[in-house]
Amino acid sequence: MMSTSVPDAVLGVLDSSLDTGDEAITITTVDEDGWPRTALLSIAEAVLTGKGRIAILLHDASTGAINLRRDGRLLVTVAAGGNVYDLRFSVQENGPILADPPRATFTGALCAVREQRAPYATVTSGIRFTLHGPQSVLPRWHNQLTHLRSSVEKF
């Protein structure tokens, strides 16, 4: 089923506490040959508003950043509320490169949402991970989220 509204369950995942910080989302971009390229982002690398505006951080020289600069089509996949959601966005690079490591900010607007569900099964989790050094990662994540929230508000 397609819609243009951000599901509350998706907003709940992206608003998860950084204290657990174990949720990942998948992004898909299109490379120069037309093939899909996937990457994982932590919840500290994406901010989504209820109005369908998104801001993400990618390593500046990553394939995803290169693809978005060229094409601007972004698919974000999130497991939430017992389902999987594909959110399509049109994005562009926005603002200066963040340093250490160099990261690019992309902002954009929601184009469509596709909900994937099966009557015979419930999705119980998406991709999860464990931080090896949360004490060194979490302060950076807090700074990233502050930057992304500011970027998405300006968009």
Language model region names:
Residues 1-155:
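Binding-site signature for planar aromatic cofactors or substrates
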